[in-house]
């Protein structure tokens, strides 16, 4: 089966969020599972620079200008790049200028991405044509609309990584998109008088997936649906909406051979984790103390991530003898709040503003608990890294967090299912009660190590996701 992924980012060459991790790992896992998989992206500078020996496949004139379609390989995966320098040759973020203003021509830049995804299914590359076109997030949403306009030359899957980003553009651009004008309606890609690239994907795809089963249901509810819940509820009832968990790239995230860790360790030999903890305490200016559990936050500092309630719970956490490490950047008031806590509780709280991939590995390899108290979380990767590294996740029961972490309740401990700490309400009180449960388990070291080993034994490798997508593709292809 031939599968084409249509997306805008690719780890490690270009990353602004979790979408890049998926695009960087899922295709390789699918190839290992026996599928013939390629990826198509805009030729952003970091991608062009990072992919060697690019060859010209086709040159063509389009509604968005002259396109050179390039092809090369990266990490064993075939990559197509859509080269239009006047659209994509811009330094920095692929979506906005240095002043953080979205590019005015984003409607055209990402319409072309969708159109090229569709053209690939129509035979643009004479030597390779996909059976399934798999589009990701709003940037690729128009792919599904173009396929529908061309009588569906391939089956389409649209994956929502985060429904909050909708790709909204003025209705006047419809004339420039090379789509039938009657697609601009409620039963189409119109959304409150604008064009929504996200809705185009949701409405026209043969099947919609999200990155966890719980999030797939949550987005059919008004609280999580961002106005799309009616359409998504219909797709759920039609059996055209499902959730498939993201995976962990074990070539990058594995404590037995992670090159970014000072000391390696495994499920069977956990002693070196304590060494990593001492290094972390020293690096963050904390008191070196084996008996103090180190809680960690590695995240964008936003209220979506529930970090306002985490900030309010700090005194409670420290009173019971814990320490806190924070790595992230985001809302100015949250940054200031965490920095103020570090100044007030010197030796107990360490904060680094910014994001450093290498340091995130050292934090997760050295901490005892990783906190992910999100208001909503489509999948979440941080808690999966925590499980893999025996750094027990403390999470709110939402989205992918609900699907991947089992609370250390007495029955879960007895059944060998416990892997972390889960709380329900997005409130300081609910989080504080979960923190209290952390300390109760921490006071029983044998039980703590038992839960660590349970967590580290869980399999969230990409091969599991690859098989689930493979089964979905097969079902679509044969119907």
Curated annotation (Swiss-Prot):
It is an enzyme of class 2 (transferase). It comes from Pectobacterium atrosepticum (strain SCRI 1043 / ATCC BAA-672) (Erwinia carotovora subsp. atroseptica). SUPFAM superfamilies: UDP-Glycosyltransferase/glycogen phosphorylase. One of its GO terms (cellular component) is cytosol. One of its GO terms (biological process) is glycogen biosynthetic process. This is Glycogen synthase. It catalyses: [(1->4)-alpha-D-glucosyl](n) + ADP-alpha-D-glucose = [(1->4)-alpha-D-glucosyl](n+1) + ADP + H(+). The keyword Metal-binding does not apply. Synthesizes alpha-1,4-glucan chains using ADP-glucose. CDD domains: GT5_Glycogen_synthase_DULL1-like. Pfam families: Glyco_transf_5, Glycos_transf_1. The gene is glgA. Keywords: Glycogen biosynthesis, Glycosyltransferase, Transferase.
């Amino acid at each position: 089966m031939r599968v084409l992924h249509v997306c805008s980012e690719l780890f490690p060459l270009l990353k602004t969020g979790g979408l890049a991790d998926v695009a960087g790992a899922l295709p390789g896992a699918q190839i290992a599972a026996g599928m013939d998989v390629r990826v198509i992206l805009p030729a952003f500078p970091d991608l062009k620079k990072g992919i060697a020996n690019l060859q010209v496949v086709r040159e063509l004139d389009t509604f968005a200008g002259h396109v050179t379609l390039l092809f090369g390989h990266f990490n064993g995966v075939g990559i197509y790049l859509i080269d239009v320098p006047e659209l994509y040759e811009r330094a920095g973020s692929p979506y906005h200028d240095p002043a953080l203003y979205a590019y005015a021509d984003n409607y055209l830049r990402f319409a072309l991405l969708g159109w090229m995804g569709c053209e690939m299914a129509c035979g643009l590359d004479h030597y390779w044509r996909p059976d399934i076109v798999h589009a990701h997030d709003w940037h690729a949403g128009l792919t599904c609309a173009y396929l529908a306009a061309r009588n569906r030359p391939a089956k389409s899957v649209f994956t929502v990584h985060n429904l909050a980003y909708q790709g909204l553009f003025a209705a006047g651009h419809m004339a420039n998109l090379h789509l039938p004008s009657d697609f601009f309606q409620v039963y189409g890609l119109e959304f409150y008088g604008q064009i929504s690239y996200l809705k185009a994907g949701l409405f026209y795809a043969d099947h919609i997936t999200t990155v966890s089963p719980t999030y797939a249901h949550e987005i059919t509810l008004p609280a999580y649906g961002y106005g799309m819940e009616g359409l998504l509820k219909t797709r759920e009832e039609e059996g055209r909406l499902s959730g498939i968990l993201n995976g962990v790239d074990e070539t990058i995230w594995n404590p037995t051979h992670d090159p970014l860790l000072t000391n390696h360790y495994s499920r069977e030999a956990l002693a070196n984790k304590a060494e990593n903890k001492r290094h972390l305490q020293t690096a963050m200016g904390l008191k070196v103390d084996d008996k103090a559990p180190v809680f960690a936050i590695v995240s964008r500092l936003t209220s979506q991530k529930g970090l306002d309630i985490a900030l309010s719970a700090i005194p409670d956490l420290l009173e019971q003898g814990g320490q806190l490490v924070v790595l992230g950047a985001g809302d100015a008031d949250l940054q200031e709040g965490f920095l103020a806590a570090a100044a007030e509780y010197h030796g107990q709280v360490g904060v680094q503003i910014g994001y450093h991939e290498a340091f995130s590995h050292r934090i997760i390899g050295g901490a005892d608990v990783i906190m992910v108290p999100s208001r909503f979380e489509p999948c979440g990767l941080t808690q999966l890294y925590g499980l893999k590294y025996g750094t027990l996740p403390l999470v709110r029961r939402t989205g992918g967090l609900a699907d991947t972490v089992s609370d250390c309740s007495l029955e879960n401990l007895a059944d060998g299912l416990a892997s972390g700490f889960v709380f329900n309400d997005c409130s300081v009180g609910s989080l504080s009660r979960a923190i209290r449960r952390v300390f109760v388990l921490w006071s029983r070291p044998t039980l703590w190590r038992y839960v660590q080993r349970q967590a580290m034994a869980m399999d969230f490798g990409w091969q599991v996701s690859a098989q689930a997508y493979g089964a979905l593709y097969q079902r679509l292809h044969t119907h």
